[in-house]
């Protein structure tokens, strides 16, 4: 599906009736984006402007995409789906050594 709520993704769904669906909820360009936003005053391409810096950002689509899939094809309420994560956020959880090893960047 996706990597995190700050990005976007794709989802394939196989329904009980055998129908297969594909949902694209990748990041989208901001509303103020324009066709010439990566060009300098002379109309030449600004190197790497689409890769780095504030002009390279997109509007995340993950939350909208997951919500769309749940609303259109789901069988549970948003509350039911989110309850386990809400419980973990409220009560916390113990990390295993394997968890901390993955998170260790030193």
Show where each model-derived region lies.
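Noncatalytic scaffold domains of N-terminal-nucleophile
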Residues: 1-106
């Amino acid at each position: 599906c996706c990597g995190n709520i700050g990005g976007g993704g794709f989802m394939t769904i196989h329904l009980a009736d055998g129908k297969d669906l594909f949902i694209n909820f990748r990041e989208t360009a901001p509303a103020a984006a324009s066709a010439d936003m990566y060009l300098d005053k002379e109309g030449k391409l600004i190197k790497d402007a689409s890769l780095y810096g504030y002009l390279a950002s997109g509007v995340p689509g993950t939350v909208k995409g997951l919500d769309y899939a749940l609303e259109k094809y789901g069988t549970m309420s948003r509350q039911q789906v989110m309850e386990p994560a809400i419980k973990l956020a409220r009560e916390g959880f113990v990390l295993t050594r394997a968890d901390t090893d993955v998170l260790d960047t030193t």
